[in-house]
C-alpha cells in the first residue's frame, strides 16, 4: 500500500467519524423493529407511511450517517480540505441529523404532524450546514484530483437531493400534493441513490482502489468524465420525468 496524495496528519480525532458510525447500527436496529412490528403488505407498498419511514430510516439514519461521518475523515485526508473545529462541526451535524431522522420516521409511523415540522427544520439545518460548509472547503482546494472533483459534485448533488426532499416534506405539511408530486418523488430517489451515494463511492474509489493494489489506476476519461456523465443523465431524466 502507499499513501501518495494522502494527508494523514490532518485526519480529525477518531471520535469525529465514529459517532456517526456507531449511530448507524442503532438506526438499523430500529428499522428491524419497525419491519417486525408491521404487516408485510405495508412494507412492500412504496407509498405507505410505514414503507416511507423504513426507507428513510435507512437512507438518513444508516447510509447518510455513514457517508457524512466518513466524509469528515476523507475530506482532510484525501482532499486536503481541513475542518478547523471538527468536533464542534461533527457534534452539530450529528445531533441535527439524528433527531431529524427520528422525528421524520416517527411522523410516518405515528402520524403526528408536529414531528414532520421538527424533522424538516432539523434535517434542513443538518444537511445544508454539512453540504454548504463542505462545498466551500472543497472548492478552495488547490491540488484538484479526480476524487476532489467527485467530492465537489457530491456536495452539489447532495444539495439538490435535499431541496427535492424539502419540497416533498413541505407538500405533506401543507397538504398540497400537486400533480407533479410523484414525479418529484422519483427524481428525489434517483438523485439520492445515483447522485448522493454513488458519486461519492465512485470518487473515493478512484484513489482507494489503486492505493490498495486492488486494480490499476482508472482511465483518465473515466475519472474525469464519469461523475459528470452520471449527473447529466440524472438531469436529463428529471426533465423527461417532468414533461
Show which residues each predicted segment covers.
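Hydrophobic alpha-helical transmembrane segments of multi-pass integral membrane proteins
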Residues: 1-243
Amino acid at each position: 500500500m502507499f499513501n501518495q496524495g494522502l494527508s494523514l496528519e490532518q485526519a480529525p480525532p477518531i471520535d469525529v467519524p465514529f459517532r456517526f458510525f456507531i449511530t448507524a447500527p442503532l438506526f438499523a436496529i430500529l428499522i428491524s423493529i419497525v419491519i417486525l412490528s408491521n404487516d408485510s403488505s405495508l412494507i412492500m407498498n412504496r407509498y405507505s407511511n410505514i414503507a416511507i419511514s423504513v426507507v428513510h430510516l435507512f437512507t438518513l439514519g444508516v447510509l447518510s450517517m455513514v457517508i457524512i461521518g466518513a466524509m469528515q475523515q476523507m475530506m482532510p485526508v484525501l482532499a486536503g480540505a481541513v475542518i478547523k473545529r471538527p468536533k464542534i462541526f461533527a457534534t452539530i451535524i450529528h445531533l441535527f441529523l439524528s433527531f431529524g431522522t427520528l422525528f421524520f420516521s416517527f411522523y410516518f409511523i405515528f402520524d403526528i404532524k408536529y414531528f414532520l415540522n421538527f424533522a424538516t427544520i432539523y434535517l434542513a439545518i443538518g444537511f445544508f450546514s454539512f453540504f454548504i460548509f463542505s462545498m466551500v472547503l472543497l472548492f478552495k482546494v488547490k491540488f484538484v484530483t479526480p476524487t476532489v472533483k467527485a467530492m465537489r459534485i457530491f456536495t452539489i448533488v447532495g444539495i439538490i437531493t435535499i431541496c427535492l426532499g424539502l419540497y416533498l416534506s413541505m407538500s405533506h405539511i401543507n397538504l398540497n400534493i400537486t400533480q407533479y408530486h410523484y414525479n418529484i418523488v422519483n427524481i428525489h430517489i434517483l438523485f439520492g441513490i445515483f447522485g448522493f451515494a454513488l458519486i461519492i463511492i465512485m470518487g473515493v474509489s478512484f484513489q482507494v482502489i489503486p492505493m490498495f493494489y486492488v486494480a490499476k489506476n482508472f482511465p483518465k476519461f473515466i475519472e474525469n468524465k464519469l461523475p459528470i456523465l452520471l449527473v447529466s443523465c440524472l438531469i436529463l431524466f428529471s426533465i423527461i420525468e417532468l414533461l
